[in-house]
Curated annotation (Swiss-Prot):
Protein name listed in UniProt: Plasmepsin X
pH profile: Active at pH 5.5.
Keywords assigned: Aspartyl protease, Cytoplasmic vesicle, Disulfide bond, Glycoprotein, Hydrolase, Protease, Signal, Zymogen
Assigned protein family: Belongs to the peptidase A1 family.
Disulfide pattern: 39-51, 42-48, 279-284, 447-448, 482-521
Recorded superkingdom: Eukaryota
Post-translational modification: Autocleaved into a p16 prodomain form and two mature forms p44 and p51.
A single GO BP: protein autoprocessing
Acidic residues: compositionally biased ranges: 183-203
The UniProt record lists the keyword Protein biosynthesis: no
Organism field: Plasmodium falciparum (isolate 3D7)
Amino acid sequence: MKRISPLNTLFYLSLFFSYTFKGLKCTRIYKIGTKALPCSECHDVFDCTGCLFEEKESSHVIPLKLNKKNPNDHKKLQKHHESLKLGDVKYYVNRGEGISGSLGTSSGNTLDDMDLINEEINKKRTNAQLDEKNFLDFTTYNKNKAQDISDHLSDIQKHVYEQDAQKGNKNFTNNENNSDNENNSDNENNSDNENNLDNENNLDNENNSDNSSIEKNFIALENKNATVEQTKENIFLVPLKHLRDSQFVGELLVGTPPQTVYPIFDTGSTNVWVVTTACEEESCKKVRRYDPNKSKTFRRSFIEKNLHIVFGSGSISGSVGTDTFMLGKHLVRNQTFGLVESESNNNKNGGDNIFDYISFEGIVGLGFPGMLSAGNIPFFDNLLKQNPNVDPQFSFYISPYDGKSTLIIGGISKSFYEGDIYMLPVLKESYWEVKLDELYIGKERICCDEESYVIFDTGTSYNTMPSSQMKTFLNLIHSTACTEQNYKDILKSYPIIKYVFGELIIELHPEEYMILNDDVCMPAYMQIDVPSERNHAYLLGSLSFMRNFFTVFVRGTESRPSMVGVARAKSKN
């Protein structure tokens, strides 16, 4: 037997103790009664699953105000939940750049379209039920084939049977009109249907040998202003243009002399867009507009690149230019941005234009350069380049009472949070997304057997669940009747939602994730699928999450990834 040399033994022991010590250093971050490791001491934040933020106070504060069409209206969310009761509806957004933010498609629906969506879904459900009834009538009449068809139900796509059912109805009617020849006709029909069914069955199985899941099917759909798509399996797919319901806007100065606009500060997109005086539609006139002709520093882009974005109900168009911006005390020269110059509504039945239901004056995207489509450098990167004393970080405090909501450039303010700020590494620098390890509703674990992640998005109001978890979620957390007087007592029986990132656990309590609307308490969650190479995405939004947690966004360096920090927000501001 070969002996292990003392040097080898010492080597393996050193590896063991090094690994153990490394694990202890990481895990002790979250142990009760111990202090977390500062990020500067955690050499691999992915191994540690995070570290402790080293506080950098900043006085560069941008006050934010809540901009909402109807501050008390959550009815659309209630209707969204109602549409999910039968488990045959999937809402989704694509990962694409747009005027409304990057989580959305160029066509589809908005959250304000829930009435129309429900109407369309119910219409399609009714048609599917009628087809199913016709199919059942057909199999009942054809007694000799009923068992054979039943045996095939689990193997053949339903649309084949719907086609057969329609054929069967015609035969059934003809047979009733020809009662004298009923037996002969019945036998002939059975024989014909048997051959046809076998042929169609073989053809269908050849064409559908790869019976992929519905999640894969809907990712490949190309929406052409469709309200609701219907799959062969009678799953109804609802594309959403964006997830906006409420926006937090702040002051931004554009041009020389400066003109004031109030854009949305959005971590879910990267481009900068501003509404201009060239947009003469009535919906444009409702918002504050920037006039490039009054700015000495405005330059129209020499590159033939125009702004044109198509929505389900219309489109907006414009051009690209550069000008000087000022955010708080920070001057940003030669910033490329999009100028919205026209808007059209193609909805024959009328309806709101984009500025009616969003009422925004611009967007400042705070995402990563990888999503940039206008210009060579994003706004925040340009700000850092021209203001080298500013640290590459910003943070959001969203007031629970619509009061002192704030964007802080270059650091944090201790007046907005309590306890420590735990930092989580960003997986891929497009969205501010981090790895999610587990998700619990009370004691029930509903995620994550497959790789999953969380996107922190200031441009989204509600939190979201993918369709694979939403049914379980609504079974565990359901809407219930309540009033202003008794809702606190009712919510005592509801579970705590726990997001697990390594050994960091973020808890949302019932009073934080439930909302009261028209004497109904409901969870502030939507079912949304976000197609991605990393499977399931869970969005944490401004109203349902950031009102409870102070959130820090830190850009990475060559030696350290970008990170998102989370701390319990103070509720007295």
